[in-house]
């Protein structure tokens, strides 16, 4: 019997799985003392952990400390609950897991084996408690897929039907923007896979700096999200500074894509990732065209990882 496929997108800003709401890539270790408020609490290896809105500093290699391992255990527990593998009132769960994950295409060669060691732990039994449910899992396999490529898996038939010679997959994430070029035949052009440090976190930093310099106020990522996406208006002047700074950042990002040879006029652009969703109105105004694809589900990569892992397991069992 195949293990249960759990897909986790370990982003620099958010952790995503196919069936749960994204949660912030932030963690507090309370040591051996349980926190006063126990929502979203994990007990692992004698330490209590809770989620926080403060994000972990950017890590090129997420296997260098314990943070993303613990975040992934929380994601696995949340996903199993959302998928119905934990019944109401159930206190113990035992499950073998195939963990489907992703990396920027340019990082896979260097980091895929590290992910296998770090998250797989040689298939050893892992015991933890999440929200008063005891989990015993074995990660019997780790599969690593290319970000961006995974996200478009459900849309490939639509993309393949396009008349353009090339499609660019532009994944604006937390810290990086990853660009993958496809030929019309669906082949990835490995000579053009770019990853550069112009993600949405840098935009937050620029907005925070502008607000601090102008108003001597500190705004966090979630306040900025609330202003840009949800219509929150903390006052005309502050609102204008946030929107103007974000617009300038998005324009610079689009122009930097053009500078590295991404042709957004003759190709078919596909935008994915939380940064694309956040900056969508500005990106659309900069494109100057109305035939493009925005994949507006921030969980798209996680959904793609799950599809690709299940497809691989099915093929192996034939």
Where are these regions (language model features)?
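Nucleotide/phosphate-binding catalytic cleft detector across ATP-hydrolyzing
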Residues: 1-167, 186-202, 222-271, 276-318
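Phosphate-handling catalytic cores of nucleic-acid transaction enzymes
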Residues: 170
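Short, acidic (Asp/Glu-rich) active-site segment that either coordinates a divalent metal cofactor
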Residues: 178-181
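Acidic, metal/cofactor-coordinating or nucleic-acid-engaging core segments within structured domains
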Residues: 211-215
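Plant-skewed but cross-kingdom recognition/interaction modules and surfaces
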Residues: 218-220
């Amino acid at each position: 019997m195949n293990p249960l496929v759990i897909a986790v997108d370990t982003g620099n800003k958010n952790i995503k799985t196919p069936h749960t709401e994204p949660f912030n890539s932030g963690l507090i270790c309370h040591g051996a003392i349980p926190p006063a408020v126990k929502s979203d609490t994990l007990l692992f290896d004698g330490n209590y952990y809770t989620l926080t809105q403060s994000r972990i500093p950017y890590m090129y290699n997420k296997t260098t400390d314990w943070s993303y391992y613990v975040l992934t255990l929380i994601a696995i527990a949340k996903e199993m609950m959302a998928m119905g593998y934990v019944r109401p009132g159930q206190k113990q769960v035992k499950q073998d897991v195939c963990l489907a994950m992703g990396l920027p295409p340019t990082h896979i060669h260097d980091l895929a084996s590290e992910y296998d060691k770090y998250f797989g732990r040689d298939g050893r039994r892992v015991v933890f408690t999440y929200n008063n449910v005891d989990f015993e899992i074995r990660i019997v396999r780790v599969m690593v897929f290319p970000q961006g490529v995974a996200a478009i898996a459900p849309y490939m038939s639509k993309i393949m039907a396009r008349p353009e010679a090339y499609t660019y997959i532009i994944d604006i994430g937390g810290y990086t923007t990853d660009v993958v070029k496809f030929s019309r035949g669906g082949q990835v052009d490995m000579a053009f896979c770019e990853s550069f440090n112009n993600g949405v976190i840098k935009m937050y930093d620029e907005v925070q700096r502008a607000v601090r310099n102008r108003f001597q106020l500190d705004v966090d990522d979630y306040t900025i999200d609330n202003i840009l996406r949800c219509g929150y208006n903390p006052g005309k002047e502050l609102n204008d500074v946030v929107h103007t700074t974000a617009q300038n950042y998005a324009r610079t990002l689009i122009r930097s894509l053009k500078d590295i040879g991404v042709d957004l006029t003759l190709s078919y652009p596909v935008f994915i990732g939380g940064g694309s969703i956040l900056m969508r109105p500005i990106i659309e105004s900069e494109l100057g065209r109305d035939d493009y694809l925005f994949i507006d589900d921030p969980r798209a990569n996680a959904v793609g990882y799950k599809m690709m892992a299940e497809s691989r397991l099915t093929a192996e069992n034939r």
